[in-house]
C-alpha cells in the first residue's frame, strides 16, 4: 500500500516542487495539491490522505487554523512547511503543539545538491509521519505537579550530576512535557533535539517561558550551571567537556554522526566520557537510531539510562534501538518519566 499524500501550499512553485518529489518515490502517491484551506478541506474528504504537507502562511485561512480544525474533525499526520523567520518558527511550535507530527523549512534550492538533500529529507519525514502516532493515539501528557510534591535533590547531586536528553520526531512536545515536570532546582541539563538552524533559539525561548528552569540555546565554551538547560543549536554538534572542575560546552561543525548534526550520539558520548557514572540520560521519541551508541557508552561508564515508552512516542525508533541494545535500565512512558528520573536522582547519596 502506497502512502497517500496531499500537498497544501499557496505557492504554485512549492506545490509543483513538492509534487514532483513525491511522485518520484514509488512508496508515495500524490492524491492532490491544494492552494488554500478550502480546497484542502474538500480534498481531505475526497481522498482521505495518510499525510498532509501544510504551509503555515496561507490566504483566507492560515495553516494553524486549518490544522486545528483538521485535528478535531479528522486527525491526520501533518508535516508543516515552515518559513525561516522568527514568526515562522513560533508558528511551527504552535503547530506541533496542536498535533502536527513534524516540520521542515521551506526549500532554498541553490544547487542540485540542495535539491537532492531536501528531497531525501522531505520524503523521509513524510514516510515517518505516515507511521507516527497522532496526538489522540498517544498516552496523555502528565499534569504539571507543583514543586512541593517533588523529591528534594541534595546539593551534591545538583552540583555533580549531569542530565542528558536526546530526541527527534515528536521531541519538541515531549521535551516540554518532561521539563515542565522538573522542579526549578536541577543539575545542569543538556539536550540535543534534531532541528534545523533558525529554529533552536525560538525552541529554547519557548521552553524558558513554559518551564521553571532557565533554558537557552547553548553557546561555545560556557560553563554548565545548575538550574539551566542547554539546547544544541541547529547544524552544530553539542559536546560536554571537563575543564578543571567544571563542565563546559563545546560546539563543533563536524561531519554528521548517525545521519545528524546535531547528533544525540555526539552529546551522549561526550557526557559519558566526562561525567561517567554521574550521568542521568533519557532518549525520547524519534526516528532512526541516533543515541543508541551513546547510551551504550553511558551504560558502560556506570550512568543511569532511561527510554520513553512506545505508547507515548510519536515515533518509537530511537528508544527502540537503544532498548534492543540492552543498554536501557528503565523504559517509562512520558507522563511518568520525570518522576522516575527525579526519584533516581533523589536516591543518590546525600551530602
From Swiss-Prot:
EC number: 3.1.1.61, 3.5.1.44
Chief place of localization: cytoplasm
Keyword Cytoplasm: yes
Entry's localization field: Cytoplasm
Any one Pfam family match given in the protein's UniProt record, by short name: CheB_methylest
Keywords tagged on the record: Chemotaxis, Cytoplasm, Hydrolase, Phosphoprotein
Active site positions, chain numbering: 168, 194, 290
UniProt comment concerning the protein's domains: Contains a C-terminal catalytic domain, and an N-terminal region which modulates catalytic activity.
NCBIfam families noted in UniProt: PRK00742.1, PRK12555.1
Family: Belongs to the CheB family.
Function, in words: Involved in chemotaxis. Part of a chemotaxis signal transduction system that modulates chemotaxis in response to various stimuli. Catalyzes the demethylation of specific methylglutamate residues introduced into the chemoreceptors (methyl-accepting chemotaxis proteins or MCP) by CheR. Also mediates the irreversible deamidation of specific glutamine residues to glutamic acid.
Descriptive protein name: Protein-glutamate methylesterase/protein-glutamine glutaminase 2
Amino acid at each position: 500500500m502506497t502512502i497517500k499524500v496531499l500537498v497544501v501550499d499557496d505557492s504554485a512553485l512549492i506545490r509543483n516542487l513538492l509534487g514532483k518529489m513525491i511522485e518520484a518515490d514509488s512508496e508515495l502517491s500524490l492524491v492532490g495539491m491544494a492552494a488554500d484551506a478550502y480546497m484542502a478541506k474538500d480534498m481531505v474528504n475526497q481522498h482521505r490522505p495518510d499525510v498532509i504537507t501544510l504551509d503555515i502562511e496561507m490566504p483566507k485561512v492560515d495553516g494553524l487554523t486549518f490544522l486545528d480544525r483538521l485535528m478535531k474533525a479528522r486527525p491526520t499526520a501533518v508535516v508543516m512547511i515552515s518559513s525561516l523567520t522568527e514568526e515562522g518558527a513560533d508558528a511551527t511550535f504552535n503547530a506541533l503543539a496542536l498535533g502536527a507530527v513534524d516540520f521542515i523549512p521551506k526549500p532554498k534550492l541553490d544547487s542540485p545538491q540542495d535539491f537532492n538533500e531536501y528531497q531525501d529529507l522531505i520524503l523521509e519525514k513524510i514516510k515517518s509521519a505516515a507511521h507516527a502516532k497522532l496526538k489522540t493515539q498517544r498516552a496523555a501528557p502528565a499534569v504539571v505537579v507543583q514543586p512541593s510534591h517533588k523529591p528534594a535533590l541534595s546539593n551534591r547531586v545538583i552540583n555533580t550530576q549531569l542530565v542528558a536528553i536526546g530526541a527527534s520526531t515528536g521531541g519538541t512536545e515531549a521535551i516540554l512535557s518532561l521539563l515542565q515536570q522538573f522542579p526549578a532546582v536541577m543539575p545542569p541539563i543538556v539536550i540535543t533535539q534534531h532541528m534545523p538552524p533558525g529554529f533552536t533559539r525560538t525552541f529554547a525561548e519557548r521552553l524558558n517561558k513554559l518551564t521553571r528552569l532557565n533554558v537557552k540555546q547553548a553557546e561555545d565554551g560556557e560553563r554548565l550551571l545548575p538550574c539551566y538547560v542547554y539546547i544544541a543549536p541547529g547544524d552544530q554538534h553539542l559536546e560536554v567537556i571537563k575543564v578543571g572542575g567544571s563542565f563546559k560546552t563545546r560546539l563543533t561543525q563536524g561531519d554528521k554522526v548517525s545521519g545528524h548534526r546535531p547528533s544525540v550520539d555526539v552529546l551522549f558520548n561526550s557526557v559519558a566520557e566526562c561525567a561517567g557514572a554521574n550521568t542521568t540520560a533519557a532518549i525520547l521519541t524519534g526516528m532512526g537510531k541516533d543515541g543508541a551508541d551513546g547510551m551504550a557508552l553511558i551504560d558502560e561508564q556506570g550512568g543511569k539510562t532511561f527510554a520513553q515508552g512506545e505508547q507515548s512516542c510519536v515515533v518509537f525508533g530511537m528508544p527502540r534501538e537503544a532498548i534492543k541494545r540492552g543498554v536501557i535500565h528503565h523504559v517509562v512512558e512520558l507522563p511518568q518519566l520525570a518522576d522516575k528520573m527525579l526519584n533516581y536522582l533523589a536516591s543518590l547519596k546525600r551530602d
